[in-house]
Amino acid sequence: MSRSLEGKFAIITGGSRGIGEAIAHNLASKGCSLLLNYTSDSSRTRTESLCNTLSTTHKITCIPVQADLSDPAPAVNTIISAAKTHFTSPTTNTLTIDILINNAGVSKDRFLNDPSSGPIDPAYFNWHYTINVLAPLLLTQACAEYLPRKPAHSGRIINISSISSSLGFTGQSVYGGTKAALEAMTRTWARELADVATVNAVNPGPVVGDMYFATGEEFWKQMQGFQDNTPLSKLVDGEEAVEELLSEEQKRLIREKMGGRRPAFTREIAGVVGMLCTEDGAWCTGSVVCANGGLKFT
């Protein structure tokens, strides 16, 4: 793969697993050095191992930084401080943050007056909005002064949104609202930061992972109509990615319980993000780029 991001530096929140981990692999393969943010002690070993692998494989610098974005102000300070410590140029004594990926997020469905979880309350609302909206806002604001000044608009900010921002899934009054807010901020930042960066969002749909396969048949049934209408979701036996990334049990569940329609692989989402981070994405800003196999068209 072309090292089109050689010498660049990116911050990825929620970079230890899932889509964030896949983005880390993609950017590292392009020569980009990384700061991977993670939240809990349970992710420390995993993130350190990931950084070691990426550093060795791709000859880049990758550091793990623990910071809990549910308390965003000190978390942002921790991330920026670590970036200054490890990525300040020894020749110019300045820090340049070329790429920011606002990927970290939380989601827990709850219906209005939910019979099992109780009504939506301020604590539930604030938990979602603090991590999914306030944290990326504060981190983007903090990174703004370190975005590259030359060439013009050469910085990249990518916000990881969701199809939930606009499709009205039941139980997602709050989560869907946070992703709609993130997309609104994307458009605002595209104008405010136009001189130094492009700003876009990417909106995945269902993604392969342990959590998706654990959601169960009720959720899969809710998604079936959407998946049936997703042009790229048909499970194709023998396809390289299918054979590499899905277990036989997962393939069985897709055939028998999901109508033969698979979720995305995380690296498919990461590929779209990676493109937006390169020079090939230079004329795209303020957009919500669909990375969901056609589940939702722009």
Swiss-Prot record:
SUPFAM superfamilies: NAD(P)-binding Rossmann-fold domains. Its EC number is 1.1.1.10. It comes from the Eukaryota. GO terms for biological process: fatty acid biosynthetic process; L-arabinose catabolic process to xylulose 5-phosphate; secondary metabolite biosynthetic process. PROSITE patterns: ADH_SHORT. Keywords: Arabinose catabolism, Carbohydrate metabolism, NADP, Oxidoreductase. Induction: Transcription is repressed by D-glucose and induced by D-xylose and L-arabinose. GO terms for molecular function: L-xylulose reductase (NADPH) activity; quinone binding. NADP(+) binds at residues 19, 68, 103, 175, 179, 207. The active site is at 161 (proton donor), 162 (proton donor), 175 (proton donor), 179 (lowers pka of active site tyr). The keyword Kinase does not apply. It catalyses: xylitol + NADP(+) = L-xylulose + NADPH + H(+). The keyword Transcription regulation does not apply. Pathway: Carbohydrate degradation; L-arabinose degradation via L-arabinitol; D-xylulose 5-phosphate from L-arabinose (fungal route): step 3/5. Belongs to the short-chain dehydrogenases/reductases (SDR) family. L-xylulose reductase involved in the catabolism of L-arabinose through an oxidoreductive pathway. Catalyzes the NADPH-dependent reduction of L-xylulose. This is L-xylulose reductase. It comes from Aspergillus niger (strain ATCC 1015 / CBS 113.46 / FGSC A1144 / LSHB Ac4 / NCTC 3858a / NRRL 328 / USDA 3528.7).
